[in-house]
From Swiss-Prot:
Compositionally biased residues, Basic residues: 1-11
N6-acetyllysine PTM sites in chain numbering: 4, 11, 13
Name of the featured protein: Histone H2A.Z
Species this protein is from: Lodderomyces elongisporus (strain ATCC 11503 / CBS 2605 / JCM 1781 / NBRC 1676 / NRRL YB-4239)
MF terms (GO), sorted A to Z: chromatin DNA binding; identical protein binding; protein heterodimerization activity; RNA polymerase II cis-regulatory region sequence-specific DNA binding; structural constituent of chromatin
GO annotation (BP), single: CENP-A eviction from euchromatin
Family: Belongs to the histone H2A family.
Modified residue annotations for N-acetylserine: 2
GO terms for cellular component: euchromatin; nucleosome; nucleus
Pfam families reported in the protein's UniProt record: Histone (PF00125), Histone_H2A_C (PF16211)
Amino acid sequence: MSGKGKVHGGKGKSSEIAKSSTSHSARAGLQFPVGRVKRYLKKQAQNKIRVGSKAAIYLTAVLEYLTAEVLELAGNAAKDLKVKRITPRHLQLAIRGDEELDNLIKATIAYGGVLPHINKALLLKVEKKKSHK
């Protein structure tokens, strides 16, 4: 054997159709970057734990869904106030207005303000005073 056999590798035949690479996000039908989420998962994993590609896809899908949900509610809040730009105040109103999102997101939103709320006990006293007069 002289070692002058077929050489594997290289570009291949020019007549073959070149395959264009598709991202993990495009294959999964997501907008958020699956590769970046996988990289963050690997970086945060303790003891060099292996991270499967399906775990990264699933986490990316969950993050995308939650973001879409919050943005939809914040957009509705902005539309109710007749403005075209979503501000932290709209995010605060959207998150605190939804019970499940309020339980999930406990963080303080900068420049979010507070929710308008009057205690029922205070309302009852005002109504009683008005009815006596």
